[in-house]
Amino acid sequence: MRIMYGLLIAIEIILMGICSYKAMNKKGRLAKIVFIYEAVAAFCGIVFLVYIYVPGITITTLCKSLTLICFDWILILLMYYTQYYTGLFHGVKIIKEAMIAFSAIDSVMLIANVWNHQIFTITEINDYEIVTEFVKTNFFYKAHFIYNYLVILLLLLSFMFMIANSSKFYSFRYEIIFIALLIGFILDIVTIRSQSIYDVSMPAYGIMCMLIYYFTLRYIPNELIENTLSLIIKDMNSGIVCFDNRGRCIYCNDILKNIYNLSLIHI
């Protein structure tokens, strides 16, 4: 079981690394966010692998801290991804800046915890468990988990909103990412008190990372291709207008421009 679990995490790390590399070679802000997101997720996977397989209180404590830090920044990247992917969160600059400021402070406190143990202490390591005792009276212990869960709930609500308000061409992609995030969140909640090294939420979040890459930069609905080809073949002499998944006009041919006297199309 221990070997199989480690092999699963290692495979996910490799796949996320491949996703990051492929996203790096694509253009656009969304591709850049996906590249950074996949890279940080792959790094988090490596740290988690070291956490469960390399013995030693100090190195295990450091890797636990780094894993928690990675989750802070992954959530920020996921919010930016959601912004560019769905068009939401454009008007919440102050909130995003506050999230970055909190994550920076939280990162410093978690690194310092390796020596001062003010947030958590690892008391025992064996083949099946890493016993972690959190200082539940510490502000940053409470703030870290409240912050993480609130952001995940916000992201889930945002994807629910997009599923309800998008065409069937795009809602399928939102649904897949929503389901993966929801499963990871539920597994995280269910196992929050578990000291087992077999954290079932980690593979779920890893799968979500790969789904994000695929449905953002690779997936094109067959129905969209068929309908687009049909439109071009049958209605070449008609006015054509195309919208993206946010409902914004991304293309308008000359015939439609002349019909409506359009001189500028915002892309």
Q: Where do the protein language model's features map onto the residues?
A:
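Interfacial "cap-and-anchor" motif at the non-cytosolic start of specific transmembrane alpha-helices
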Residues: R2, F161-L231
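Sensory modules in modular signal-transduction proteins
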Residues: N222-L256
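Structural signal for the C-terminal ends of transmembrane alpha-helices
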Residues: I18-K26, Q83-G87, F159-S167, F215-Y219
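Individual alpha-helical transmembrane segments in multi-pass integral membrane proteins
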Residues: M1-I13, G28-V114, F145-Y149, D199-G206
